[in-house]
Design a protein with these regions (language model features):
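Metal-dependent DNA phosphodiester-chemistry modules and their immediately adjacent helices/loops
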Residues: 115-124, 128-256, 263
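Short, surface-exposed beta-strand/loop "edge" segments at domain boundaries and coil↔beta transitions
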Residues: 42-49, 58-61, 132-137, 426-431, ...
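Accessory interdomain/linker segments of ATP-dependent helicases and helicase-like nucleic-acid enzymes
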Residues: 7, 285-429
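Long, charged/polar, low-complexity intrinsically disordered N-terminal extensions
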Residues: 1-122, 143-176, 180-181, 188, ...
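Mixed-charge, glycine-rich, non-catalytic linkers/tails in nucleic-acid processing enzymes
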Residues: 193-341
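Structural motif
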Residues: 37-42, 67, 127-130, 423-424, ...
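Conserved nucleotide-binding/hydrolysis modules and their immediate coupling elements
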Residues: 386-478
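C-terminal effector modules of nucleic-acid-centric enzymes and ribosome-associated factors
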Residues: 123, 436-440, 444-532
């Protein structure tokens, strides 16, 4: 935790209200995000109980599994979910624009520019908290290898159409959520926690109701009191007024309301199956419908408060102006979405359960590179974030007190002006350490030369971005009296070493993938618990 974050938390405790840790919004928010509030069944890993899903805050679609242990009902739930999610994704897949991309020419081996399609926008999925992201990944894995009756007429318990496709998309969203700065799949508690500091622990910030109580408490109520009320207050039935954001449910809800309702549903279904004539079957069907309606009402009572809280949180975030580099990161999300769309269109198989060595190394390198890029861009976009880097000795700001023109040695001398900056910061500078400042959106480098006046003055030598002439371009060198900020971290991240092709994977990393990798993986084996 940075010093700025620590101070903000202390100030939140003192004032009774969450304090901002950012002056701009560092994540892109779509104009029409798809919000998903899922619930799972206690004791059944990954077994969905229900969900509220949709793009209209006033008209969410309620999906319910009245008996979560029934495979057919689970598949029906997933089919309904696919009917909502896939059309939403398709609205972005067809709207494209022309773009250029560097690719390797197979004949010459050189990098050349080619014109390709890029989706003009991309879908965005919002879940209440981090466990919601993990559930999306779990659902994606459980669905993408399923076989439909059309794909394999002999498969037992075939999946409904589009369920495997939904699994592939959810897997892509889940994988993209692991890339720092990506906004295709967002957990609202994490985004809110990035922009505000509360007076409670990071673990307590995972409770969406408590987090919002600190950020936007009722008039006259301290944040700590409002958060405690959100966590503990119960109604006359002993149920939480602000239920957990899911996907796990409150044990009191499971034991007192949900379990008896599911038992009544099971009894009604058994009675319907045992009905001996049409009149009795009509009566039993009415009982089954009433039991299912009761479960739907229970699920909606647990998901609707969270649904409203998610949209309230989005309103708070939209009040912040978007950071300058958030658009660039969203463009990379658009490229990712376009690439996955193209892979599906080309008929490629689902993502494997386990990545090969080269793919895994590439993913790890990408995440490390994107984390460094995100840290740098947030500081460049936000003076409050930059203040934290300055306190950590990773940047410094001050006033230019002197500029002395100097030149490099050699046949073609180049300008290397010496710039003296007066600063109250204490950056961790060493001999010939490079520092960077933003000049017209591009990083300009300088070398540390030395300190003067016990560190109050920092002398730098500017080394690039001054043009090709013997004299620096106008505006490329700081002038006396300018306020400037230099960082010790690079603004742009360089790509790592090129990894070998998959067929050239060294034996130290398992060797080239075998033929078995090319065979499409099958779904998990069917167990007795899958079907009632």
């Amino acid at each position: 935790m940075s010093l700025i974050s620590t101070l903000a938390r202390l100030e939140a405790v003192r004032t009774g209200r969450a304090q901002p840790t950012a002056t701009v919004r560092h994540r892109h928010l779509s104009e029409r995000p798809l919000v998903l509030v899922p619930l799972t069944t206690a004791g059944e890993a990954g077994a969905p109980l229900g969900a509220l899903v949709g793009t209209d805050r006033d008209a969410p679609r309620l999906l319910v599994v009245p008996q979560p242990r029934d495979r057919d009902l689970r598949f029906a739930f997933l089919a309904e979910l696919a009917d909502v999610v896939l059309p939403y994704i398709d609205t972005f897949a067809d709207d494209v624009e022309a773009a250029e991309r560097n690719e390797t020419d197979p004949e010459t081996g050189k990098r050349v520019k080619v014109e390709v399609e890029l989706c003009a926008d991309a879908p965005q999925l919002i879940v209440p908290s981090r466990p919601g992201i993990e559930l999306v990944r779990l659902l994606g894995r459980s669905m993408r290898f399923r076989r439909t009756a059309e794909q394999d007429p002999e498969t037992p318990h075939p999946a409904p159409p589009h369920v495997p496709l939904l699994g592939r998309w959810l897997t892509h969203f889940g994988e993209r959520a692991r890339v720092p700065g990506s906004a295709l799949l967002l957990a609202l508690t994490e985004v809110l926690g990035r922009h505000w500091a509360t007076g409670q622990s990071s673990l307590e910030d995972q409770h969406l109701g408590a987090l919002l109580a600190w950020i936007d408490p009722p008039d006259g109520v301290p944040g700590a009191e409002a958060a405690l009320d959100a966590e503990l207050r119960r109604d006359a039935q002993g149920q939480l007024v602000c239920p957990p954001a899911g996907p796990a449910t409150d044990p009191a809800f499971d034991n007192k309301l949900l379990a008896p309702a599911i038992e009544r549903y099971d009894r009604a279904r058994t009675a319907l199956a045992a009905a001996e004539d049409g009149l009795e079957a009509d009566d039993r069907l009415g009982e089954l419908t009433a039991a299912e309606r009761e479960i739907r009402a229970l699920v909606e009572s647990r998901t609707r408060p969270t649904w409203d809280a998610v949209w309230h949180g989005l309103d708070l975030l939209r009040a912040l102006p978007e950071g300058a580099h958030a658009v660039d990161r969203w463009t990379r999300d658009r490229w990712s979405f376009t690439g996955h769309r193209d892979r599906i269109t080309a008929g490629e198989p689902p993502q494997p359960r386990r990545d090969d060595a080269v793919t895994a190394a590439n993913k790890l390198a990408t995440r490390e590179r994107e984390q460094a890029r995100l840290d740098a861009q947030e500081a460049l976009d936000d003076p409050l974030v930059m203040a934290g880097r300055r306190l950590a000795g990773e940047a410094f700001a001050g006033e230019v007190t002197d500029v002395v023109m100097s030149y490099s040695e050699g046949k073609s001398p180049r300008p290397r002006p010496l710039v003296t900056v007066r600063t109250d910061d204490r950056p961790h500078l060493g001999e010939r350490v490079k520092v960077f400042r933003s000049l017209g959106g591009k990083p300009q480098s300088a070398e540390f030369v030395g300190h003067e006046e016990d560190g109050a003055l920092v002398v730098l030598r500017v080394v690039d971005k001054m043009g090709r002439g013997k004299e620096p371009d106008v505006g490329s060198v700081p002038e006396k009296g300018d306020r400037i900020c230099f960082t010790l971290f690079e603004h742009e991240q360089r790509g790592g070493a090129k990894l070998p092709d998959q067929e050239d994977t060294p034996w130290t990393h398992g060797g080239p993938p075998g033929e078995e990798i090319a065979v499409q993986e099958s779904a998990d084996p069917v167990t007795e618990e899958d079907v009632l």
